[in-house]
Amino acid sequence: MWIQVRTMDGRDTRRIDSLSKLTKVDDLRDRIQQLFGVALESQRLFYRGKQMENGHTLFDYSVGLNDIVQLLVRQIPDSFPTKHKECELSDASAGCGSGQRDSDSGSGEGAMDVDGQSISIIGENVGTSLYKKNDLVDARDLNMGAWFEAQIVNVSKKVGPYGTLPEVSDTSVTSDAIIYHVKYEDYPENGVVQLTCKDVRLRARTTLPWHEIKVGQVVMVNYNPDEPKERGYWYDAEILRKHESKKIKEIYAKVLLGDAGDSLNDCRIRFVNEIYKIEEPGSTYLNTESPQKRQNGPECKHCKDNPKRACRMCACCICGGKQDPEKQLLCDECDLAFHIYCLKPPLSVIPQDEDWYCPDCRNDASEVVLAGEKLKESKKKARMASANSSSQRDWGKGMACVGRSRECTIVPSNHYGPIPGVPVGTLWKFRVQVSESGVHRPHVAGIHGRSNDGSYSLVLAGGYEDDVDNGNEFTYTGSGGRDLSGNKRTAEQSCDQKLSNMNRALALNCSAPINDKEGSIAKDWRAGKPVRVVRNSKGRKHSKYAPEEGNRYDGIYKVVKYWPEKGKSGFLVWRYLLRRDDYEPAPWSKEGKERIKKLGLTMQYPDGYLETLASKEREKENKTEDEPIDSPSKGKRKRNSDNEQTAAKSIPKKMKVASYKLTLEQKTLIKQDVLNAKLWSEVMLFLKEGPKFVNKVEETFLCICCQEVVYEPVTTECHHNICKGCLDRSFKALVHSCPACRHDLGKNYPLNVNKPLQAILSQLFPGYESGR
């Protein structure tokens, strides 16, 4: 097993070989120290967001083959001299740095720092301040640009960090230097907000009649940018045009969204009888007795702020009651309210914690692994046979234990028949690669299937000594009858086999009624369910049809018959006769060998495997060169040039791959898919690369939501292909934009399926739509 270690900045990546699943993190740190030269105490290792700690193994962190572990070099702080620290302490005690405290203490009623500038609170009036303490004003919300009714609670002036405070009577203080501390009347939870003069003005109190509203006039109107037909908040607006008929009055205006210059053009104002005049600065101050309050849009769209109506959105989400607001808790994650007596279990008092989370959002603190902590015990791994075994054998070096690095999603796991893009004759070095391709999913088991459905694939490996393999037809012995307790992979036959589990699954593929006593023979064997067959090099000792190395996909077979009999071990076993039924030629035939050459099918290795072998060979060569020669040899030593020539000969030449051939119907469907013409022009360039064409189609037409080949594709106006089901779920969540580029599609966007694209994908990936 090997992994890659990459520095956090991504500049240096090294491969570490000869590892095991049971390798300790402590040992991994030693290997990293040898490669990177980073001290042990300076290493911080991360894998999938977890910090790896000593005492655990790679298996505990589920580190897979060729996975990347990130290395962060811990910076050790420099130690300051003791004299320097004593000097700092003595300076502080002697009054060094006390100028800031003096200035703070001499800043009147109090001082604070905002945006790097000092604000000194003076009191009720500051120089040329337009408004005084307790004045009723309109204050602008800096995020929305809307105006809300507020009251001034204090006034201050702003000076630089090193400036001196002018006198209160100094008239040179400009309005921009005045800070108003206001409190919104309807939103006391926001506290006191500091605003400048441009965001504060006198409370609007004059409604304009229809005849006084002029085109070009700037007034204050009620508008809802999200729902224009509903009541919203109060914005400044410039009148664009007005129209009056016998039944209706219409006003269109440009709504101004704040001081930044943003605006909404040609907006229809619904509430034409509630248009306010903007008060000029310097007008008569309002008294504390406010005029009639303006009406804003409801905070809750569900209950329209009706106090008598129960609502689980703006009130307690359990009972919906609006009583006892002082006994409600607001979840800091989902923002839903809860009565303390509605919780399970109920609370007697409001908790004093700064943050509170509801039962659905709260994380179990006992399951959270903090940085520097050991991993929690996994119940799943504790039940494994390896956890209870007393054997000291290192089982973690085998390729069957590394786990899949990818998974086949083109077709579901219960797919019958060939896998799209995997031709007959494909070779893999290890069984885990066969699992990743989807041809045979189990890593170790010989039969893949379900006892109530059938068998999807099987592997011919070592098998039984009395199995017969004739290539196009072979006998196969079922599974079971062996004691595989603990972590054993194989054992001698010790009891009779039963027609259950995988044996029954393989029997269901036979086109005959199931019979668990005598077996059955198919009248029409071709009508049975197809089984994908993979031959392993371990079967070479029994069969000449097995590959010399690795695993080979040999095509589709059908079960002709199955029957029970006593094997050489003396116990009852179930035997199956399978016969080849595939239009692709067998890989051992003359036609099959020519097809393999045309398609350029060669042995497939895991990522990093060849590099690992090369590094091991270099290590062996270095060791042999470093070994002292005890006695002179009569033979001549080979020159490096000879070694290089032999190495060059061992590298296979790149074969010319046969082009992928499309049928006439497929070419017609591609031409009909006009919306994806640009994508198809790029994909068609891969026709000359044979089987890679199918992989390119899969990569190009991948749904960005489900990360699988699009099913019932909807080609958007921005030329992205999304599954109809995925886009429909997005629309139900009120997200009406393209998932790929966020282009606004609108609420009423039609979800029309691209039928030519669906047809061509169904032909290139037969069976991929099952289970979607």
Swiss-Prot record:
Renumbered residue ranges of the record's region Linker: 291-299
Keyword Acetylation: no
GO biological process, one term: protein ubiquitination
EC number per UniProt: 2.3.2.27
Region (Tudor-like 1): 129-205
Enzyme class: transferase
Protein biosynthesis is among the record's keywords: no
Main localization (coarse): nucleus
One term under GO cellular component: nucleus
Pfam families in alphabetical order: PHD (PF00628), SAD_SRA (PF02182), TTD (PF12148), ubiquitin (PF00240)
Pathway: Protein modification; protein ubiquitination
Positions of region (Required for formation of a 5-methylcytosine-binding pocket): 464-467, 476-479
Region of interest (Disordered), ranges: 90-111, 615-649
Limits of the YDG domain: 417-580
Residues annotated as site: Required to discriminate between hemimethylated DNA versus symmetrically methylated DNA: 487
Start and end residues, zinc fingers (RING-type): 703-742
The Ubiquitin-like domain, residue ranges: 1-77
Residues covered by region (Histone H3R2me0 binding): 331-335, 351-353
Site residues, Required for affinity and specificity for 5-mCpG sequence: 489
Catalytic activity: S-ubiquitinyl-[E2 ubiquitin-conjugating enzyme]-L-cysteine + [acceptor protein]-L-lysine = [E2 ubiquitin-conjugating enzyme]-L-cysteine + N(6)-ubiquitinyl-[acceptor protein]-L-lysine
Site (Histone H3K4me0 binding): 314
SUPFAM superfamilies the UniProt entry points to: FYVE/PHD zinc finger, PUA domain-like, RING/U-box, Ubiquitin-like
Free-text comment on this protein's domains from its UniProt entry: The tudor-like regions specifically recognize and bind histone H3 unmethylated at 'Arg-2' (H3R2me0), while the PHD-type zinc finger specifically recognizes and binds histone H3 trimethylated at 'Lys-9' (H3K9me3).
Biological role stated in the UniProt entry: Multidomain protein that acts as a key epigenetic regulator by bridging DNA methylation and chromatin modification. Specifically recognizes and binds hemimethylated DNA at replication forks via its YDG domain and recruits dnmt1 methyltransferase to ensure faithful propagation of the DNA methylation patterns through DNA replication.
PANTHER family named among the record's database cross-references: E3 UBIQUITIN-PROTEIN LIGASE UHRF-RELATED, E3 UBIQUITIN-PROTEIN LIGASE UHRF1
Protein name: E3 ubiquitin-protein ligase UHRF1
Organism: Xenopus laevis
Lineage, highest ranks first: Eukaryota, Metazoa, Chordata, Craniata, Vertebrata
Gene encoding the protein: uhrf1
